Amino acid sequence: MKKMLVTGGTVFVSKYLAEYFAKKDFEVFVLNRNTRPQPENTRLIQADRDNIGTALRGQSFDIVIDTGYAEKDVRNLLTAFDSPELCGSQKYIFISSSAVYPETLPQPFKESAKTGRNKIWGDYGTNKIQAEEYLLSQKKDSYIIRPPYLYGPMNNVYREAFVFECAQKARTFYMPKDGSLKLQFFYIEDLCKVIETIIEKNVQNHIINVGNEECTSALDWVKTCYEVAGSPLSIKNVDGNIGQRNYFPFYDYEYKLDVTLQKELLPKTQGLMEGLAKSYEWYKKNQDAVSKKNFIAYIDKEIAK
């Protein structure tokens, strides 16, 4: 049985990854501060990523899946081992982001495109770039995954959860402009499947965009969320002069990733309807796990008044 280390492990992406691979033929360890419930069937290594200390001395892992945010996260992890080679002796997989691509590049963004600061994502994107570059300088055979908007069960980010809440409360939905904003999504279990293929096979490409091949409009996304929640949808369009991040979970920014390389590893992705239906089933039982924003209060005070 191979040993796997997942950094984090207590919220959305890292938690889903840890539980997914714990059900497979892996002995899964998670590295976190132990301030939240741990993923099922995993073993905890309790440490703060900024101060790992001796928690990883004497340890070695065949596979590492790293959800770190910045160069220091990767550096702290690699230097916490007796040798960096022991940190993912077979595969080191870093979950990066589509935020590494400047908004000025031609779209769809290809993996070969030059990374740089994106004015929408700011430091989040540049921190991911620096983490990628440092990792490749230390472990050149590492794999880097660049997803768009991830969704699915365990998503604690107030995206589909916001729309589900509106649907459950039979609220009119306030849609930015005409709802034509294009969004690219990727289902969390599809991310797991791509990583599983990377682990099992000798994948030649080491930087891989992931995502659904087709984007969906904000309007269709909201319609689908209301449909899986079993609620009729009434929409009011909101003037573009009102900052949409005050009342909507996405920026007024369209982008698309080229996922040609991903299709070699995962020819078929989860349909949005089925994926959101699974998200809703999780949401109904775990509403307290979602990090809510004040969208509804803002709408009621500033828009619907």
Annotated model-derived regions:
Residues 197-248, 253-254, 287, 293-304:
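Mid/C-terminal beta-alpha module of Rossmann-like enzyme folds, strongest
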Residues 4-24:
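N-terminal Rossmann NAD(P)H-binding glycine-rich loop of SDR-like oxidoreductase domains
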Residues 35-84, 94, 100-101:
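NAD(P)H-binding glycine-rich loop region in Rossmannoid oxidoreductase-like domains
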